[in-house]
Amino acid sequence: MSRFLSRLELEAMGFASLGADVKIDRQAVFINPDTVSLGDHCRIDAFSLISAGAEGVRIGRYVHLGASCQIFGGGGAVLLEDFSCLSGRATAYTSSVSLLSRIKNLMFNPTLPEAFRSISQGPVILRKHSGVGCGSVVLPGVEMGFGSAAGALTLVRKSLPEGVVICGNPPQVLLHRDRSELERLEEEFFAMEWGEPDI
């Protein structure tokens, strides 16, 4: 038996949309798959958890989620555009308890009503060719610009401009990636023997 689910098994899960050549490990877990859209040639590895909320999780073409990735979409939409990726054990949150509340004595436990907690919510967006390194955490409201990246074990608290690569805690800018070079590589990729996939 293949480690990846068959097409029939994928169709039976009831995704909002399902592209061609989607590879999902049998050990991956989906909560609310009816709000998850999967693009062509995406791959989700073992022990990953995709917990989609009402606004859904949209995964584009040629997107990779490494082993043990976690996406928590209860607080807003999650969008991973084409060629983006989450490396192993990376996590994206659309909702979290705010520790910066002016009211110091709120509680954290999610089993309690929101009146007792200070919640920060917002979408998480990874634009084309952006990536999150292993063990990194992306907090609510973050948009990673085209070609941007966060290296391993980085806490991404703020949106990243196009092409910016950061790493560390606190994060430091390591370099800038060139949009035209990434677009050239994409064109070269699609010009290979298999060509651009049907949409």
Regions found by a protein language model. Give the residues of each.
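Short, conserved structural micro-motifs that define repeat-unit consensus positions
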Residues: 18-22, 60-63, 145-148
